[in-house]
Amino acid sequence: MNAHEVNFDGLVGPTHNYGGLSYGNVASQSNSQAVSNPKEAAKQGLAKMKALMEMGFKQGVLAPQARPDTAALRSLGFSGSDEEVIRRAAKEAMPLLAACSSASSMWTANAATVSPSADTADGRVHFTAANLNCKFHRSIEHPTTSRVLAAMFNDERYFAHHAALPAVSQFGDEGAANHTRFCKDYGDAGVEFFVFGRSAFDSRFPAPQRYPARQTLEACQAVARLHGLSEAGVVYAQQNPAVIDQGVFHNDVISVGNGEVLFHHEDAFLDTEKVLAELHDKLGRRGGRFRAICVPRDQVAVEDAVKSYLFNSQLLSKADGSMLLVVPEECRNNPRVWNYLDQLTGDDGPIREVKVFDLKQSMQNGGGPACLRLRVALQERELAAVNPGVIMSAGLYDTLVAWVDRHYRDRLSETDLADPQLLLECRTALDELTQILKLGSVYSFQLD
């Protein structure tokens, strides 16, 4: 059955800034208050999309959120016109304005969890927007995320959309950053791998002590039920709490999977042997041959994995059957990581090539190649039903670069967030973007 994995990358929004909002994300916290360059950030992301498209990979784009979010500020007691709301928030509660101005939706691995039609009970592709309950600045994203996804995947014959889980800590859900899928071919029934950091209701599971575990077992189970997944096609695993406390805030910072391969750090999971055995068994029953590539801690320490974002990479299947690992520049700058990658590609394993991208603007906020994309496996007929306006092409790339040049600033500091003109600039840009991507009205300011 002919099917493709399509990577939908998040377009970096015009308010990209370094607010240091993400406790537990080492890069985000260490670069707090630095001056950002939204124009460069957006172009770095677009360059990656274009390069992968030109290599033959299916590539799409996911629109950013409208920021500053004046509706969120109003819900917190700020009143008056939009301009007055921003000025008052800047004067009285700058951290709230920074949170409501975050461009964190660029990391579309957190947008939703996606289950392909081959896995689901009703034979449709299922989407559940992530509630991102752990962080206020991200918890306000899911209503717009749901509207954008519905505008992209709008044929009910093929696509089913679910609202985010209840916005409470017991159902904390971070989307595809804690989810991957193994399969022989993208169109075959596969095994969906859900990784959680803690259990909300079962005290037998340990929890990290320093940083919060953002994903619960109960959220994973709820998404699997919503998507109509069978027990034979699901594996749940607990991430090692010790690595969460070292800055591994999502599982895609310590492992990445694709096809029949899991590329992971030795310390990524609890009960690793049991987890790998279950993946091997369940994928085998679905016609696949599971293979784990374990990176030993004595070659790459967890600290190096977090600094370089070795595992926050894209693992892509090439036409010849081998795999390509897309990594950030920071991997090349870390001798231990780069030596390991040189050894990896020299071995007779599935990962034969490494491609490096400069994503510094995103990386300084704690997001690498994997954070920037949402993977959707689609049959040919499903791909044909996707809104064509969001599928990357040479023409769309040129249009989006020109759009960025027209609307984005090349410098943004925290004090700039207090400028009401920024709100006007962002809304003007996004109103035009919805026309470019043929999304219709998806933003609150378009619906009011």
UniProtKB/Swiss-Prot annotation:
GO annotation, biological process: arginine catabolic process to glutamate; arginine catabolic process to succinate
Pathway connected to this protein: Amino-acid degradation; L-arginine degradation via AST pathway; L-glutamate and succinate from L-arginine: step 2/5
Keyword match Transferase: no
Substrates-to-products reaction catalysed: N(2)-succinyl-L-arginine + 2 H2O + 2 H(+) = N(2)-succinyl-L-ornithine + 2 NH4(+) + CO2
Pfam families membership: AstB
E.C. number(s) listed in UniProt: 3.5.3.23
Top-level lineage group: Bacteria
Residues of the active site: E174, H250, C371 (nucleophile)
Single GO term (MF): N-succinylarginine dihydrolase activity
Xref: SUPFAM superfamilies: Pentein
Annotated substrate binding sites: 19-28, 110, 137-138, 214, 252, 365
UniProt KW keywords: Arginine metabolism, Hydrolase
Role this protein plays: Catalyzes the hydrolysis of N(2)-succinylarginine into N(2)-succinylornithine, ammonia and CO(2).
HAMAP family xrefs: AstB
UniProt record similarity statement: Belongs to the succinylarginine dihydrolase family.
PANTHER family, alphabetized: N-SUCCINYLARGININE DIHYDROLASE
Summary of subunit composition and partner proteins: Homodimer.
Name of this chain's protein: N-succinylarginine dihydrolase
Taxonomy of the source species: Bacteria, Pseudomonadati, Pseudomonadota, Gammaproteobacteria, Pseudomonadales
Name of encoding gene: astB
